[in-house]
Regions:
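Residues within the alpha-helical elements of helix-turn-helix
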Residues: 56, 94, 111
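N-terminal helix-turn-helix DNA-binding core of bacterial DNA-binding proteins
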Residues: 25-59
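Canonical helix-turn-helix DNA-binding module
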Residues: 50-81
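Short, positively charged and aromatic/hydrophobic N-terminal segments
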Residues: 11-14, 18-21
Length: 148
């Protein structure tokens, strides 16, 4: 692990309260979490139910109902005739971006010696605050140095 990579993580693990840009539009961290969880559930099970989103995120069903209403109104999700949640293209793009960040940051933190559960939790926090430019640089650095 190079010193440069370690410096990135020391810097970004302390970043909080900065403005985030995802796909050149602002979106709240909670919305990113919901979209990412929906993508993960779709990959795991082939479908996404509100109750499963609640279980995955550790939130109440009414919280999921409120969030899905807002996400639907914003054009990120819809519901199929069976009531399953379907990610629309804008929501899928955000979910994939967050999930990619989460996986890469988790792997890098583990390579730095962070315990796996802590690495996952920290990656979840970092993924939301990292600019596109900074994440692209970290990803490029990791690939060039075969750190992931």
């Amino acid at each position: 692990m190079t010193n440069l990579c370690l410096c990135f993580f020391l810097l970004f693990s302390r970043v909080s309260g900065i403005f985030r840009t995802v796909m050149k539009m602002n979106i709240h961290k909670s919305a990113e979490d919901y979209l990412e969880a929906m993508l993960m559930l779709k990959e795991e099970r082939g479908y996404v139910r509100s109750i499963d989103v609640a279980d995955k995120l550790g939130v109440t069903k009414p919280s999921v109902s409120y969030a899905t209403k807002r996400l639907r109104e914003s054009g990120y999700i819809t519901f199929d005739p069976a009531g399953m949640i379907v990610l629309l293209e804008p929501g899928l793009e955000i979910a994939e971006r967050m999930y990619e960040r989460h996986k890469l940051l988790t792997r890098l933190l583990i390579r730095l010696g962070v315990e796996a559960e802590t690495a996952r939790e920290d990656a979840c926090r970092i993924e939301h605050d990292l600019s596109v430019e900074s994440f692209d640089a970290i990803r490029r650095h990791a690939r060039e140095h075969r750190e992931v």
